[in-house]
């Protein structure tokens, strides 16, 4: 089990005074708590690429958010798939850029009479990590309807139901699920529709009007359980990685 965006101290087994995480606590009691375990990077995509490849950012090249993980790198999910595992990804991946900006999109502009490098020499690596095969998580394509699904196998995952972005701005496959459950989901999402709350001061944070039953995490739990149930019916003896 690898938890995404979870502070180490936001577990009751780590001493949090309010939060209760009984299931994770039971795993901790039966296993090992690593108190000096460090992420490979401070940025999201860099750490995810390290988890997938077992390599440091200096080797896999994802040194910043907005840099796609190259398909040239072997992932542990590909190895599991090759060994006969059923593989599925439901939720956030962020192995490819999904925002509206980033190093691969925000290119250097020559000014004051400078000369830009010729095409093909603008990056340290000649083989591009953009274009075909690298737009699976690009949210503008999901919003416009240009993209309806992820190209599989996706870094080793045969079944993919994707979530992009964060909070109540999540898109991808989740957005279709949300639209099936509310006639006007955008009326509940975003800062303009947030519940007023003076406790929120960070510009990227607000109290969402989206009810818990429609949270992205609710979708992940529902669809994850559905996939597990289907797998148990269809291939009960096949190992899996979700």
Question: Where are the regions a protein language model picked out?
Answer:
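Formylglycine-dependent sulfatase
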Residues: 1-242
């Amino acid at each position: 089990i690898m938890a995404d965006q979870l502070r180490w101290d936001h577990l009751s087994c780590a001493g949090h005074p309010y939060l209760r995480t009984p299931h994770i606590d039971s795993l901790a009691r039966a296993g090992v708590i690593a108190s000096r375990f460090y992420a490979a990077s401070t940025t999201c995509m860099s750490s995810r690429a390290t988890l997938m490849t077992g390599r440091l950012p200096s080797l896999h090249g994802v040194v910043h958010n907005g840099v796609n993980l190259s398909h040239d790198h072997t992932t542990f999910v590909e190895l599991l798939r090759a060994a006969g595992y059923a593989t599925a990804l439901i939720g956030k991946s962020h192995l490819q850029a999904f925002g509206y900006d980033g190093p691969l999109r925000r290119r250097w502009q020559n000014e004051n009479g400078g000369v830009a490098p010729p095409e093909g020499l603008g990056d340290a690596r000649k083989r591009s990590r953009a274009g075909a095969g690298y737009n699976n998580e690009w949210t503008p394509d999901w919003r416009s309807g240009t993209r309806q699904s992820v190209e599989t196998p996706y870094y080793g995952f045969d079944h993919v139901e994707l979530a992009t972005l964060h909070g109540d701005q999540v898109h991808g496959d989740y957005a279709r699920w949300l639209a099936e459950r509310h006639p006007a989901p955008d009326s509940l999402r975003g800062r303009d529709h947030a519940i007023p709350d003076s406790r929120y001061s960070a510009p990227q944070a607000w109290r969402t009007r989206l009810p818990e039953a429609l949270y992205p995490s609710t979708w992940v739990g529902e669809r994850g359980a559905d996939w597990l149930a289907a797998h148990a019916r269809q291939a009960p003896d096949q190992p899996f990685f979700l």
